[in-house]
Amino acid sequence: MKKEDLRIVYMGTPDFAVEALRQLVEGGYNVVGVITMPDKPAGRGHKIQYSPVKQYALEQNLPLLQPEKLKDEAFVQALREWKADLQIVVAFRMLPEVVWNMPRLGTFNLHASLLPQYRGAAPINWAVINGDTETGITTFFLQHEIDTGKVIQQVRVPIADTDNVEVVHDKLMILGGKLVLETVDAILNDTVKPIAQEDMAVVGELRPAPKIFKETCRIDWNQPVKKIYDFIRGLSPYPAAWTELHFPDKTSVVVKIYQTEKCLQ
């Protein structure tokens, strides 16, 4: 089968997901449909804002679906009508089996870590927060448990001591687009040899990457300097580490900190 004949459905929402879609389209792959989150009001005026993936899909005149519920019968039927051979997921939602099990060649996900490390919603943040000097990206086939499917390919990426989460995000975004294309080509050429995550060598214990909430971002000044430094850059520029300044009149103000320099070890 030629790449032009492979029917691909792409699922994603944020900027991180646009790059792989762009490389697929510009590479001449047959993207027959795009699925993204429903539009949401944003800002003070609560104006409807399109997701970055939707904006790109509209620019390229790609068919688009924005389901509220992924098990909705109308959505599932519309998805079936696209007759996808392969589905690709990048920074989207957890899919029900009726969706990920639909294409004959399966559904694969691009995850921003070296699985099985950092399974979860915020792998880039936690890799930087934990002071890692290396992270990476992984493509893997979806199965029932989140981020546990068989690994297809991985690429390692260094993290510099001065990198914040935005810098690492952008590195992984560009390389992730290339890895998605390489994974599609491997599937096309039937050269994929998936590896079960439990069979992969892991240095140290497995670290999770849970969703980050506001309280997660509060700085603990009792931590060592290096940990505070890594914590701040692992949350910069978004959602941003924060602390409280207390004044003699017993008032206080919340301050977000985006950048620091280490003066002590």
Task: Give the role of each language-model region.
Residues G27-N30, M37, L86-P208:
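Donor/substrate-binding cores of folate-linked one-carbon enzymes
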Residues A201-Q265:
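Internal anion-binding site segments
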